[in-house]
Amino acid sequence: MINPFQTLDKQLDQIQSWGFEFADVTDNTDGACLGAEFGFTAVASLDANPFDIRRMFESRGITITSICAHANLLDPAAPWRYGTSQIIKAVRMAAAIGVKHVITTEGDPQTGFGQSLSTEEALFTIREKLYEPLRLAGDLGVKILLEPHGHITDSVDNMEKLLNSFNSDALGVNLDTGNLWLGGGDPVEFVKRLGNKIEHVHWKDMPEEFISKRGTMFGCGMATIPLGTGVVDIKGTFEALQKAGFAGHTTLEIAGEEAVLKSRDYLKSLGA
């Protein structure tokens, strides 16, 4: 999402005008969305004809690189919570239109149940809710990528435990530099430990005022500053990814035209 209160086609027009050729399907839900029908939100429906969505991107010369399916994996399953069912729909959509990656994460628990889980209970809950999506992804040739965006996945130790416990070829990692740093992690160390699992990157830098929140806040949707101007070691992370042999797509999760374009230039200056 680039601008609030703007439909998906208008968002794509904007990034096309900036010269971008790749993008994610980010905000989505199953069923219908009033905001999308009446023209003030960029939500895509997981129940839509997936080829209509692909055509919307392709008509602007843009290739879909992933479908985001960020979920609530720690609270109890319920019809109103984005979880296993929606991830499965995202996997089916991706497979239908030739998109390799579906990106998900556990999110912040909102209920007393989710907030009271021990680390081991949380790891088990995530495993249980991703079991069927991973089976389907494996059968359909799609990979589910876990993103640091919660108190479990922001820990490289816990992320490694999850990856090992699934033992699935359909599971990989989407590195989010801003989320990981904000949750208390070190993106450079993360790449050194799990670089061979990383298949997509969300780039975000964070301003100094977030230092006091580090380790207590898990995930932020969009950065508001250009890459290379904040406190995250973007250059070191880029170099670590190069050493790890990373050759996948990356996404600028950054708000504002000036910040987006400066970030693109910064990555190019590093050799992207």
Where are the regions a protein language model picked out?
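Histidine-acidic metal/acid-base catalytic patches
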Residues: 1-24, 58-60, 98, 153-272
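A short acidic, glycine-rich active-site loop
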Residues: 38-51, 121-123, 221-231
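Glycine-rich, proline-tolerant flexible connector loops at the mouths of alpha/beta enzymes
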Residues: 24-52, 106-117
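Flexible loop residues that form catalytic
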Residues: 28, 72, 107, 206, ...
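Short secondary-structure transition/capping segments
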Residues: 34-38, 77-79, 114-117, 157-159, ...
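Short, well-structured secondary-structure segments
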Residues: 21-27, 63-68, 100-104
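Short glycine-centered, acidic/aromatic-flanked micro-motifs in structured strand/loop junctions
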Residues: 69-71, 146-148, 177, 252-254
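Active-site acidic/histidine proton-transfer and metal-coordination neighborhood
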Residues: 9-11, 16, 51-59, 73-172, ...
